[in-house]
């Protein structure tokens, strides 16, 4: 068989050698001399084949990245579902409150939500826009004022109750003040000392 160029001859030899190396166990593949005479398209094809064969480390890395992305998607979906459930619960409680059907558990939840919102308002960082900052400060003051008034009323009511209980116990004789007995002077003092 005659070849018109060295390139076509090397292509034919490479193809035959490749065929023999895959079929016969004792034959060797292409030598470095022959591989250098391969066309650029064949070299590119071989390079792409080698790139497609990933090492174990690369496979692990890709698997890890895919797992991380999947975990992130699941986490985001759970957060969205949790946020939706909270919002639905809030709207249900708000509806019950306007209807006057608020249960004790729902009232506790509202108190907890108010405390949480007050704390988050107290922790708000600095804001650059003065209009937004002034509006936010006004809202914060209104909420804190309402919360303080409720707290003050409750504290005053508790203190009044404690005072009434104490006075009623003293009047009944259940408890007594420590100190002087009525009509007696303290020990060690004379009647002549009038200071």
From Swiss-Prot:
Keyword Membrane: no
Single GO cellular component term: nucleolus
Origin: domain of life: Eukaryota
Protein location: Nucleus, Nucleolus
Coiled-coil features, chain-numbered ranges: none
Predominant location: nucleus
Pfam family, one: RRT14
Keyword entries, A-Z: Nucleus, Transcription, Transcription regulation
Signal peptide as annotated in the record: none
Known role: Involved in ribosome biogenesis, probably through modulation of rDNA transcription.
Family as reported in the entry's similarity comment: Belongs to the RRT14 family.
Name of protein: Regulator of rDNA transcription 14
Organism: Debaryomyces hansenii (strain ATCC 36239 / CBS 767 / BCRC 21394 / JCM 1990 / NBRC 0083 / IGC 2968) (Yeast)
Gene name for this UniProt entry: RRT14
